């Protein structure tokens, strides 16, 4: 597993470091120029709000723009170009491989704490499979190398990098648990993670709308069965489902 993760980290990092003449050389694309100016504007103005933090780039007008990436990068010491390069390296070679590892571990059951002798054999096989997928992920150009280099759509890439974590939390939510405290913690973490994905870039709302329905349907069906014998249980679930749909519709309309 460590070998697969090492390949997933080393290959994209090596590609970026060998292509750039130096960390202070900005990517020669339009979006990179805008994002570098956004980092400088946040540092000078001291405002990283998504609702007006980049007003200096819009002739003083307060407009919506996802500034999570720029706000985080602006906290690092150094001029905008090298700290942005460091951010590109961190997301491409650290955040995404670890995010992918978490999703694969959850999907294959490697995060399970207890295992029988038979399960241990299967666990070793799954570990090898996950390590192979991690190593092969370094050869995928579509993400994160393309958005982080040739396109320089860094806020969007940050939003996509957070999606595996949300899916892991979705899967944990649909599992039965006896502790209401644990379930409440998972709900709060899921809301925070989903909110972070949307805050990083508005298209995160659309991505969540595409990825969430299978998990939500499974969760609602299981809750429907459990609440069937309770008075008012089904009505409460229907109300929650309607409210969720309304929130998605209103959010999609606002982000259009």
Regions found by a protein language model. Name each.
Residues 207-244:
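Perimembrane helix-loop-helix junctions
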Residues 1-20, 235-244:
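Start-transfer (signal-anchor) and selected internal transmembrane alpha helices
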Residues 10-12, 135-143, 194-198, 245-253:
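Aromatic-anchored segments of alpha-helical transmembrane domains
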Residues 181-202:
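Membrane-interface alpha helices of multi-pass inner-membrane proteins
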Residues 113-116, 163-185:
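Membrane-interface transmembrane helices that cradle and orient dolichyl/undecaprenyl
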Residues 31-38, 42, 240-256:
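Transmembrane-lumen/periplasm boundary regions of multi-pass, lipid-linked membrane glycan transferases
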Residues 96-107, 162-174, 192-193, 209-220:
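Transmembrane alpha-helical segments
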Residues 13-161:
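Active-site lumenal/periplasmic loops and adjacent helix-entry segments of GT-C-fold
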């Amino acid at each position: 597993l460590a070998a697969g993760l090492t390949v997933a980290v080393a290959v994209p990092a090596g590609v970026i470091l060998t292509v750039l003449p130096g960390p202070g050389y900005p990517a020669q694309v339009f979006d990179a120029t805008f994002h570098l100016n956004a980092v400088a504007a946040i540092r000078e103005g001291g405002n990283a709000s998504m609702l007006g933090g980049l007003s200096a780039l819009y002739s003083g007008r307060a407009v919506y723009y996802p500034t999570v990436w720029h706000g985080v990068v602006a906290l690092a010491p150094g001029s905008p170009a090298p700290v942005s390069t460091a951010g590109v390296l961190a997301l491409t070679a650290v955040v995404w491989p670890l995010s992918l590892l978490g999703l694969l571990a959850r999907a294959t059951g490697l995060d399970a704490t207890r295992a029988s002798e038979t399960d241990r054999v299967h666990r070793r096989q799954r570990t090898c499979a996950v390590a192979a997928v991690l190593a092969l992920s370094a050869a995928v150009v579509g993400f994160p190398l393309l958005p982080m280099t040739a396109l320089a759509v860094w806020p969007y890439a940050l939003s996509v990098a957070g999606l595996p974590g949300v899916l892991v939390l979705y899967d944990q939510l649909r599992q039965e648990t006896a502790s209401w405290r644990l379930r409440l913690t998972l709900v709060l973490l899921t809301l925070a993670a989903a909110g972070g994905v949307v805050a990083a870039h508005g298209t995160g709302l659309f991505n969540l709308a595409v990825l969430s329905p299978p998990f939500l349907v499974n969760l609602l069906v299981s809750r429907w069965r459990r609440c069937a014998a309770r008075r008012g249980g089904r009505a409460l679930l229907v109300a929650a489902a309607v409210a969720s749909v309304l929130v998605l519709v209103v959010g999609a309309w606002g982000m259009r």
